[in-house]
Structure formats: C-alpha cells, structure tokens
Regions:
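Single conserved hydrophobic/aromatic residue that forms the stacking wall/gate
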Residues: 1-12
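TRNA-recognition modules of translation machinery and tRNA-sensing kinases, especially anticodon-binding
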Residues: 57
C-alpha cells in the first residue's frame, strides 16, 4: 500500500546476504535483496518505480545513498546495508556519480576486455579481483550499481556508456544471481549464491563460497 500510494517511508536493512550468521544460520537474508528489487521494477499509478532501492558499496557511497533516500519524497526507499567491515573503494572515486544508480569506479579511460559489476560489499571484492586480472594484462572496468532502478531511469546514452551492449560483463552478488542478470546482458555471467547460508565467520564463508579476488579472476577467465 505504501508503494502504491507514493507514501514516503524509509526501510533500512542492515544485515544483507550470508555474512551475518556466525552465531547460527537464522538470519541470513540471501533471498531478500531479490524480493526487494522486484518492487523497484513495479510501477505505481503515476508511472514511477514503486520503490527506490539502494545497496551502497562502502561508507562514502552510503552517504550519497542516504541523501538520495532523504530527498526522495515520491516513493518509499529501501537501503540494504552490510554489517561486516568493508574496504573503501579506490582513492579518487567520484562518489557523487552514485546518484545515477550505476557508475564507473575504475577503468573509465580504457576499452575494457571485461566489465565487472556489483553492488554493496561485493564491489570491493571486484576491486581486488581486478588487480589480479590487470596483472595478467587485461583491461578491466569496475562498475558499482547501488540502484538498478535509478540507472535505468538515466538516458540511454549514459546506460550505454557505463554498460555497453555486447560487452563482456561479469556480475558478482552475494544474493541470488537474478539480482544482476538484467545488467550483464547476453554475453555476461553472474556469480551468486543459490542456497541459504551457513554458520561461520564471514571471512571463512567468503572463502568457502567463492567470494574472493581469486575466484573473480577464475570466473572471468572461464567466461572469456
């Protein structure tokens, strides 16, 4: 009802993905990002996305997303946040571009061999994986996409600039792969989680479930 009636409300979800189950697998919302993002694709009676969904990559991007949510008076907003420590994005990152829903974190001046895209804490994993790929001679672009809904509201030329049609795009998500399938395109691939999580420290889970720089490297090499 809130989404249909354009009522302003903010929902903050502070335990995303599978990394919060160290004291038992009782609250790992692997599936919930996909459920929330479905509401972003549903229009209200005024033709707007019925919900603004934002999953920021680090503390600075969270500041931008918080401002977007506070300024959104037309629809409810949902912020999907992480509880574990997250590496900051590379120095010099233009965080203001997050207001467009998706933007280039690194590799903007090159014709990339592959584009890496994620939201939330997975972006920092892509940064680490990109370092391995670049050491292997590859040209890599990294895209942070806190809000697909905002990104799809940008002009087609901007969308093409960030994620060109026909590009090789690899997506990493700690939720269901469907979270990024609309971004990677026909030539892309998504590595995600298709089951509920486990009870263990988050760094152990990252390693066991493949959310590491090395697996980003392996997955991209396999895709190409």
């Amino acid at each position: 009802h809130l989404c249909d009636r354009r009522q302003r409300q903010m929902c903050i979800r502070d335990s995303d993905a599978f990394r919060v189950g160290e004291d038992g697998p009782t609250h790992e919302p692997v599936e919930q990002e996909a459920q929330i993002r479905l509401m972003e694709k549903l229009k209200n009676h005024h033709g707007q996305n019925s919900l603004l969904v934002l999953r920021p990559a680090d503390a600075e991007e969270t500041t931008v997303c918080w401002k977007l949510a506070m300024e959104n008076t037309d629809t409810p907003s949902a912020l999907i946040l992480s509880r574990q420590n997250i590496e900051m994005l590379p120095e010099g990152n233009d965080y203001g571009q997050a207001a467009k829903g998706a933007y280039i974190v690194a590799g903007s001046d090159e014709n990339p061999d592959v584009i890496l895209v994620a939201s939330g804490s997975e972006v920092s994993t892509l940064v680490a994986g990109a370092a391995l790929l670049r050491a292997d001679g590859m040209k890599v672009r990294i895209v942070s996409c806190p809000s697909e809904g905002l990104f799809r509201s940008q002009c087609p030329c901007y969308q093409e600039e960030i994620l060109p049609a026909g590009a090789k795009i690899f997506g990493l998500t700690a939720g269901l792969p469907v979270n990024l399938q609309g971004l990677v395109g026909a030539n892309g691939k998504v590595f995600g989680l298709e089951s509920f999580g486990f009870s263990a420290p988050y760094k152990v889970l990252d390693e066991k479930l493949g959310f590491t720089a090395q697996n980003v490297y392996n997955q991209v090499k396999e895709m190409l």
